Amino acid sequence: MEKPGGFWIPKKSNKESSWEELAFAEDDAAGSLWPPRSYTCSFCRREFKSAQALGGHMNVHRRDRARLKQADDQYLFPKSSSSPEYPSHKDSDNIHETSCYTLVFNTKPNYFKTQHSCVIDLSSSSSLPYLTPSRVSSGLPGKQHTSSSPPSFVVEPSKNSKYIPSSSPWSCPSTVVEQKSCDLYEIPAMEGEKKRKTESDVPKIGHKAKLSLGNTTDLSVSMNLVIHQSFPITAHGSDEEIGRVDIRKRRRRHESPSQQSIFISSLSCKSDIITRNEESKHKGDRFEDLDLELRLGTDPPKGI
């Protein structure tokens, strides 16, 4: 064979060719199959002609195995602690609730065991008509209730209405709740004349509580609504919760005089405004009488 340059290239014989060339030549001639052209799946023993097809088929098997594993995990662990549950509101012997909800009267006081206190800020207009869980923060367990105690709510003043004493706005524990119980006490500081009202002001019949705020809209800046809610105490956190209860009681004792002073100051400001309005009205009446007498030509009174 001669190339355009004039060089001779000897032709290789079959013996001098490489083993790879010989193998592919035999494959083309329908001889021995090398390299193998059939790929078998190890799971279903299905044969494929190319490695790419086998790889896609193996991806299907991987997805199926992942789904089976996920189904097994859900069967072993059906409930996860991260997802919150909502109440069914059914009258049965075992009532399961796992978070804070709207204020509901208790129809079965025998379920009272222990209670948590939740604080709702009344200064914001969004939390007044609807007591949503986003404005509720859990407190600590307090005193126990007897079976004869009626359901009620607690309204008490706070030192700073913008501050809600909790670590997170939705921190109610996701444990089993038996029932909800509350006590209503209204603490307006009317210059030391009125005392705390008992729970007789709360209606004892009904499923949902209707809060009659009355004339407390001016005082809502420095008031918080405290809802006592029953939760069973867990065994691992009993000592820590008891210590927190003592600290919270001490803080309330220290904060009570300052809270009353805030109410007194707000009421005194309101009374000053009323007296000023009365004085200005009285002076206006005097000037009207003087103007009328000047028009008629009579002498003005000497007292003015």
Swiss-Prot record:
Q: Which UniProt keywords apply?
A: Developmental protein, Growth regulation, Metal-binding, Nucleus, Transcription, Transcription regulation, Zinc, Zinc-finger
Query: Is the keyword Transcription regulation assigned to this protein?
Result: yes
Q: Does Cytoplasm show up as a keyword for this record?
A: no
A GO CC term assigned to this protein in UniProt: nucleus
Q: Name one GO biological process term.
A: regulation of DNA-templated transcription
Q: Which InterPro entries match?
A: Plant_dev_regulator, Znf_C2H2_sf, Znf_C2H2_type
UniProt GO MF annotations: DNA-binding transcription factor activity; zinc ion binding
Region: Disordered, residue numbers: 71-91, 135-157
Q: What does this protein do?
A: Probable transcription factor that may regulate cell division and growth.
| The name this protein goes by in its record | Zinc finger protein 10
